[in-house]
Amino acid sequence: MGSDKRVSRSERSGRYGSAFDRDDRDDRDSRSRRRDSEYKRYRDERNDQYDDYRDYESPERERMRDRERRNSDRSEDGYHSDGDYMDHDYRQDYYMDEKESKTIMLRGLPININENDIRELVESFEGPQPADVRLMKRKTGLSRGFAFVEFYHLQDATRWMEANQKKLVIQGKTIAMHYSNPRPKFEDWLCNKCGLYNFRRRLKCFRCGAAKAESDMEAPSGSSETPQSADYYSDSGYVSSAIILRNIGPHTVVDSILSALAPYVSLVVSNIRLIKDKQTQQNRGFAFVQLPSALEASQLLQILQTLHPPLKIDGKTIGVDFAKSARKDLVLPDGHRVSAFSVASTAIAAAQWSATQPAQQSGEAGDYAYLQQGQEGNSNFGQCSQDYQPFYQTQTAAVDQDTAPQSEGSPVPATTSAVVCQSPQMYQQPGSPTQSGTSTAASTTPASTTSTEEATTPTAIVPGVKYSVPDTSTYQYDESSGYYYDPQTGLYYDPNSQYYYNSLTQQYLYWDGEKQTYLPAADGTGQSGAQPNGANPGTSKEGKEKKEKPKSKTAQQIAKDMERWAKSLNKQKENFKNSFQPLSSRDEERKESAAADAGFALFEKKQGALFERQFLPDMMMMMVNTEEEKPPNAKYRDRAAERREKYGIPEPPEPKRKRFDPTVVNYEQPTKDGIDNSNIGNKMLQAMGWKEGSGLGRKSQGITAPIQAQVRMRGAGLGAKGSSYGVNTSDSYKDAVKKAMFARFSEME
């Protein structure tokens, strides 16, 4: 036993070998894992470093670029995001001649450089100034090593490249410059039948099922690339009435933009929209300038783009271009694209421009078109403009005819025509405000034309014929009657009751918004005294006799009659509609009538002061008369006694019932007296063979009586044995006292 040597822990060997072998194997595994991770990290860093020079022709990279291009977002002004610059081919190809472009790429930039450094360096050189500088960044915010410099014109870019010999020194490092040209790419194709964009791999339209070959045959080759290649600036032929100003400073205000554009165009604050960030409340770098027409916008754009030096606002060079709409473009049969929104705005702008031109330029205004026929891609719009030329000429002729001086109260005429280019339909408000102005001036001007005489002559209103919605802004106030005269229909309008009076038929009418017509009011409510003065176009003697009457008396009579009319007709109108109209039509009528009567309500608020001034003396006299008629000594009126006489004395209230206290159940001892045999547990045990009085278990060895806690025996002192008188913990104080008294009595015996 003494010769046996105990084996140490280090020398043990068993099923899994010695401990040294296991430690060595673990160290080798950890070192190999560490080496693999370091190699993987080094490979990732190397790939990121040379990410810009990868093979961009591989199918995997092509799919990734397509995915990024689809997911890339565009800003509100249509300017390209950073992902869209991947469409440019910035690979080095020494075997191909570079194609000149107005976009120049700076390659090999330091990582810590930013856009401001590049912009300051480029602007410090003499010669053409750039329109925009864009530094490409990663998601982490670091530079990718290249940037794009955009010029207004191709000549400026080529001259700048020749002046700097295609090299630029930034932070002591020579940077190579190259022309950036977009590579031909295959995009999503547009169906010419339904106008839906389809994925480029889809052979049939997703909506209508038209074949892709049909769209390719109708659209000439290269039509899909034409808009995309010129997406940056106005070389694509896109025309709009709005201009975008880029490279706006973060703290530039609207007044600075107005002062900078003041030498070239006259603008107001409402013509400029400065886009700001919602969080920082600073400018986002661009603003929009809205001009009356596309012609003025193109002229201003041409002036600003040819400025040398370029336009600067708060020390920043401003880039100018047409503002593009965010709507989908439409493809014409000849392959050119144009926005549907610009078509509608084109016709409206042309109509407004032609109506506001002076008489000597009427010929030019009639021939004006928003998109000229000679421009490329706008041949169809020339035909559209010819369809609307008769409408423009009629508008211009109306302006020429209305040469009579207008009254001070007549509103300024405004063209509110709307044109839809899908079908050459014209929508015009009947009864322009210019007629009202000429009718007013006809009474004072000795020589008046036939058109003004027709405007002043009221036309007979035919019930059931649809008319245009009444425009209260064109009504003229008649001092003799105190009402407003409608020169279009020849009716007199009362803003208080919103009823019309026809002087030809001596009939009262009201406007029905659902039927779009004037309906006669009910008869038999006293129309004779409600006829306004000057309404009947009779002889001059009758007019003079009516004018000689006191105005206050006439106005007072008319006010009383119209109030009486309003009350009776409103009741009849409500009863008639409620009895014959279904529930569904009532809801629609409420909406339409609310829209139709909105102008009347606003007009009534505006003209309320005129009626108050006119009827104020009469109302004061009426109030004085009513006060005089009141009894001098007003006695106290016991309304409670009158109520008792009329309805009798009410019965006294019933006496309140006495409240009975509910029986109190001692919730602490619910089973003190035991439970009966009707409970579920007892029934289940009896079903299994248990009988009352026997214990539980296989051999009925369980207890039959409930377990009760015994109270500690109380002793009188040391060594003295106490007594137990059978008091339980569940006993009350009275029961315990009774048991104690009984135990003492038994011990004494």
Swiss-Prot record:
Keyword Hydrolase: no
Residue spans of biased composition, Low complexity class: 429-460
SMART domains: G_patch, RRM, ZnF_RBZ
Source domain of life: Eukaryota
Intracellular or extracellular location(s): Nucleus
Record's GO cellular component terms: nucleus; spliceosomal complex
Domain G-patch: 677-723
An example Gene Ontology biological process: mRNA splicing, via spliceosome
A single GO molecular function term of this UniProt record: zinc ion binding
Name of a matching Pfam family: RRM_1
Coiled coil: none
Span of zinc fingers (RanBP2-type): 185-214
Record's protein name: RNA-binding protein 5-B
Organism annotation: Xenopus laevis (African clawed frog)
Lineage: Eukaryota, Metazoa, Chordata, Craniata, Vertebrata
